[in-house]
């Protein structure tokens, strides 16, 4: 399947938010974690709308026939749909955006939580091998360079078999904002820190908000991991940080 067709399937399963008016609007793509699309991400979508963006809360599972149970059993355990394969969704939605009059397809901001952050990182790290790595025959790494202006990585998975720490992004990429949790019992903070340090060494601009007392999924009041502790105060801080990242990205253009 070609990018635009897969992008249509992805967006048909996803939820789109828009500011008032006809646009074209810059667009924030919001990628869920391994447990699937959950309601708390819609609060981040609203933050994007308040910053003047349209937002798409991307559902990567429904078009693939992955149920919530199977996501927990197989995606969260790393058995299926590694980040580099899910990265196909990014290339596809970027292609789809170019067909939408309401979207400014060349002012895109990517935001990923946990597994969604992994997908963003592997999309960049796959480089010129994007088509082979993602399985999307026309996946074009130039889309990332020309259409995406900023990225937010929230407690991203960055261990094996993630590509960023080992390969980097080829010294090319948008400004990166990140949120790490000091008591993250799922992805930790050391592996994500190493990946971000690699990007910094490669010359990218990287900014980090570190919540020392936060667990994984601290911003999700319905987290599927019983070890997660919901922190509404840190959720608010992270939404504010996201809003600042969105605004600064537009202001820098």
Q: What is the role of each PLM region?
A:
Residues 88-171:
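Primarily recognizes the serine-hydrolase "nucleophile elbow" in alpha/beta-hydrolase
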Residues 182-185, 213-215:
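Acidic beta-to-alpha connecting loop that harbors the catalytic carboxylate
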Residues 23-25, 30-68, 160-161, 185-188:
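Short substrate-entry loop that stabilizes the transition state in hydrolases
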């Amino acid at each position: 399947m070609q990018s635009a067709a897969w992008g249509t399937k992805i967006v048909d399963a996803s939820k789109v938010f828009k500011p008032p008016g006809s646009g074209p609007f810059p667009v924030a793509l919001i990628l869920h974690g391994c447990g699937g699309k959950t309601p708390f991400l819609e609060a981040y979508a609203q933050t994007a709308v308040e910053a003047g963006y349209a937002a798409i809360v991307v559902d990567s599972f429904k078009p693939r026939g992955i149920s919530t149970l199977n996501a927990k059993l197989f995606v969260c355990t790393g058995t299926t749909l590694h980040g580099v394969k899910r990265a196909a969704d990014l290339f596809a939605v970027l292609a789809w955006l170019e067909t939408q009059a309401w979207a400014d397809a060349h002012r895109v901001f990517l935001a990923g939580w946990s597994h969604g952050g992994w997908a963003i990182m592997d999309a960049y790290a796959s480089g010129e091998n994007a088509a082979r790595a993602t399985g999307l025959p026309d996946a074009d790494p130039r889309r990332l360079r020309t259409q995406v202006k900023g990225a937010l990585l929230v407690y991203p998975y960055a261990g094996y078999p993630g590509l960023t720490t080992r390969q980097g992004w080829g010294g090319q990429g948008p400004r990166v904002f990140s949120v790490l949790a000091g008591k993250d019992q799922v992805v930790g903070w050391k592996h994500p820190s190493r990946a971000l340090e690699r990007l910094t060494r490669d010359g990218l601009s990287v900014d980090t908000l570190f919540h020392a007392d936060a667990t994984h999924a601290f911003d999700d009041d319905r987290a599927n991991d019983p070890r997660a502790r919901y922190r509404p105060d840190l959720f608010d801080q992270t939404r504010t940080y996201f809003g600042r990242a969105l605004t600064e990205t537009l202001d820098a253009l």
